[in-house]
Amino acid sequence: HRSRWKPGAWTDDTDMMLCIADAIIKDKSVNLISIAQNFKDWACGIPMGIGRHTFNVLHIGDYVEKPFDVSKLIWEMSGKRIASNGGLMRTSVVGLLSTNVEKNAADICRLTHYDPRCVASCVIVSRLIHSLVYTSSPLTYVQIKDIACRYDERIDSFIELSKNNDIRTL
């Protein structure tokens, strides 16, 4: 996968993170339609590395006008099984916002990844970054479990496994 890029070049994950950052800077707030438009513009260019799921969502005709509806439709068409991690890599920038981190991370994730497991992972990582930047301390294990369970209880067992020092248990 990585061999398609020159050393030091960024991937689709960084491109999409920049779509989020550019929209926030331009609008001076989180405007989901603006972010969706940036995603669509990027996808209609040369979106090297774009995943199949993200491609499918962004290439539905009325995506920009109804991004949540389109994202949910593609997820439902998969039998509610698609839970890829594409939303996670790009929403980390949301953790740098001073307020509304959880809502913004959840909403931005849902622009392309509607599955609640995807949403929870984006919220957890964004909240972790926010906590480290603004309080210099990470979220507690209990806080992470609480966030996960608010979105999808299936995540709890993976949070439990993360306490183990052996990555093979995951």
Model segments located where?
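Structured, active/binding-site neighborhoods that engage oxygen-rich ligands
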Residues: 1-170
